[in-house]
Amino acid sequence: MSDSISVIREKLNQVTSEHDPFFQKCMQDERKGVEKLLQTTRRKWEKEAQLRNKLEEMKQYETDLFQQGYKYIAGVDEVGRGPLAGPVVAAAVILPDDFSVVGINDSKQLSEAKRDALYETIQTEAIAVGVGIIEHNVIDQVNIYEATKLAMRAALDQLQPEPDFVLIDAMPLKYTEAELSLIKGDTKSISIAAASIIAKVTRDRLMQMYDEKYPGYDFANNMGYGTKKHLHGLDTIGICPIHRISFAPVKEAKLHFDSLK
């Protein structure tokens, strides 16, 4: 074969099977560079196949429900139960039955760049998206568990059309009789995973904004979780207006600074 390595690389990017005549021709090329390109191409195909298989696995709950006659299946998830500061955010997403975007998974397993890209895709292709945000002061009043349910209900209330079935990550919500709670649902249901991405990106952007408003806690990086830098900020600056007073480290910091007044 007279093609250069760079030309072969470009051509292999268009090939989708080992049975392709060009791939077969490359297999006869004894150059080490071509051999490496073939190995890279095979690995790419394997990864793409894994992603397609994962997509089909994660659509199984939705597929079964569509076959039962349900039309608007909402997935619900939340982010922000554990942080010491900021709101808890929930999202609800209704996807069309032909949604086939690979790579959607539990938002915590995705890079920030991948989450941001999928966020835009979901917002564009979803039938409906709802977001519920429950602030720190309500969390302190009702506790984080109840606040999470409030956020989920608020997200579901925004959906138009209304869902006729609800898939929820982990916690029973009793929003409707037609609902199912799935442990680790964001790794099992495409709708819940999509909701986890919407919730995560929404909350992360809020915390990045709060980092500019309340510097000294590293909110842009820790998203309000109790990291070393965040705890150092509590020890040296005290609390800020978005801290959750009912959470132990925040309560202790408040008591300490109140005692100095």
UniProtKB/Swiss-Prot annotation:
Enzyme Commission number: 3.1.26.4
Cofactor binding summary note: Manganese or magnesium. Binds 1 divalent metal ion per monomer in the absence of substrate. May bind a second metal ion after substrate binding.
Entries under PROSITE patterns matching the protein: RNASE_H_2
Pfam families on file: RNase_HII
CC cofactor: Mn(2+); Mg(2+)
GO cellular component, one term: ribonuclease H2 complex
Residues the record lists as binding a divalent metal cation: 77-78, 169
UniProt key word Metal-binding: yes
Top-level division of the source organism's lineage: Bacteria
Compartments where located: Cytoplasm
Signal peptide coordinates: none
Keywords for this protein: Cytoplasm, Endonuclease, Hydrolase, Manganese, Metal-binding, Nuclease
Primary localization: cytoplasm
NCBIfam families: PRK00015.1-1, PRK00015.1-3
Similarity comment: family membership: Belongs to the RNase HII family.
Role noted for this protein: Endonuclease that specifically degrades the RNA of RNA-DNA hybrids.
Protein name as it appears in the record: Ribonuclease HII
Organism: Listeria monocytogenes serotype 4a (strain HCC23)
